[in-house]
Amino acid sequence: LEATFGNVAGLAFTESTELIFSRSNYLMYGNNQSVSNINTFGFSQKMGESSVLALSIMSMGFGEIDITTENIPEGGIGTYSPSLTNIGVSYAKEFSNSIYGGVTLRLISEKIYNLNSSGACFDAGIQYVTGSSDHIRFGVSLKNIGSRMLYGGDGLSFRGNAEEGDYFLTISQRSNDFELPSLLNIGLSYDLPMLTEDHRVSTSGTFTSNSFQKDQFRLGLEYAFRELVMLRGGYVYQEEVTNSSYEATMSGLCAGLSVELPMGSSKFGIDYSYRDSKVFQGTHSIGVRIDL
């Protein structure tokens, strides 16, 4: 189900029914404070022998922020709470033993005080699995391909003095539309040969072409013991990342841990991950999964 974020084609590997919930403290600072809290929920269901349908919801909140104006810059006149919400519907299919594909339609809503914007986009991906034991995987995905977005609302209007005459006018401003940050991912993973099936070591690499920032390279390593405990580590490299004037906020090291707890024919999983950041104290994420 997590594949709906990276490469939706991976959703086709869902065996039955899966539920997931996660919470991320994005860019920690101070005393356990964060710039934003991100809550995600997902549900996937296998349909027939080769198709999977999924629903995903992401809500990003920034807490309460003091309202300030030119005349009252110190605040004290109320607060507002910006929010971003994405709702996606995904479909993935197993075309053969080697080829998997999927697509996601996503609705986007952004609100900042008395301004709001909405739009729609889609993601698409394909995966190719090969090797004597399906130990080589290649994937390509496109994300955030959609319409331009535009902010509107009462926040674009204000009361001003007329140039001639002793009265006020309501003045409306126009906002400029903007593109979504589309990107292209090309990835490859390889399972190293092991002496026993109790252990698995997988390596992966991904190239990301971003529309509004420099391209990125990602390297990952995962160790699994009996597919019950998984340890992961990774590194995100970006051109000129060693120059503090150009480095991205989210680059460098990352790590994660997953534990699968069998419950009869079902599984209960716990996930944790940490991503390093250059300015703040990193991003912590924790999630739970249920496979029915």
Each model region followed by its residue ranges:
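Subset of outer-membrane beta-barrel
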Residues: 1-292
